[in-house]
Regions:
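Acidic, polar ligand-binding/catalytic clefts
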Residues: 1-55, 123-131
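Short helix-initiation/N-cap motifs at beta->coil->alpha
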Residues: 1-3, 51, 85-99, 134
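Hydrophobic residues within well-ordered alpha-helices
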Residues: 5-6, 56, 96-98, 138, ...
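A ligand-binding cleft/hinge motif common to bilobed small-molecule-binding domains
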Residues: 15-26, 73-77, 98-132
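Bilobed "Venus flytrap"/periplasmic-binding protein-like clamshell domains
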Residues: 17-18, 35, 39-90, 109-111, ...
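Periplasmic-binding protein-like
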Residues: 34-42, 109, 113-156
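Ligand-binding clefts/hinges and TM-proximal coupling segments of bilobed small-molecule sensing domains
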Residues: 70-85, 124, 155-172
Length: 172
């Protein structure tokens, strides 16, 4: 996503992009429009195996993440004892989970909700203990202040109309 913005392949990334300092060095962010956090996702048959985040930090647990994502940084920092499977794009970490090649993947609240609806054998864990709460913003080019101003005004208008509140209520 970042490389597409910096290469001028597109003007805006409107996914649930978490704000990080490292990303902000390369791209611009709009004003925040919501928050997200990280939660583990596993197969339903394994849900009883994991009661807390600490249960994931175990050499007998394989955790998948996509290279170059904020999830990679999180897993390295918070789950250093876990066995990891690094997944390179265009493949996705959750595909490894669906296929049963890993025990867990770390996902955003939104993506975990969508994946659990789409793949009935997956279940999010620890919904009451979401980690790494961060603001969400849309990505734009750093050097286009006019476009950033437009996008910020759009975010403010949509926020005042309750649009993002309804999106967050629907998707978590």
């Amino acid at each position: 996503l970042i490389s597409g913005i910096t290469a001028n392949k597109y003007d805006v990334v409107m996914t649930g992009t978490s704000m990080t300092v490292s990303r902000a060095k390369a791209v611009g962010y709009t004003l925040p429009w919501g928050r997200t956090g990280y939660m583990p996702l596993t197969q339903k048959k394994n849900a009883g195996r994991f009661k807390t985040w600490e249960d994931l930090n175990d050499p007998n647990v394989t955790v998948a993440y996509n290279l170059g994502t904020s999830f990679e940084e999180f897993v390295k920092r918070e789950l250093p004892k876990a066995k990891v499977k690094r997944v390179e794009s265009p493949a996705r970490d959750w595909q490894e989970l669906v296929a049963g090649r890993v025990d867990v993947t770390i996902s955003s609240i939104l993506e975990a909700s969508v994946l659990a609806q789409k793949h009935k054998n997956l279940v999010p864990l620890f919904g009451d203990d979401v980690r790494n709460s961060v603001p969400l913003g849309f990505l734009v080019a750093q050097d286009d202040q006019v476009w950033l101003n437009f996008m910020n005004n759009w975010v403010m208008m949509k926020t005042s109309l309750g649009y993002f509140k309804s999106v967050n209520e629907k998707w978590g």
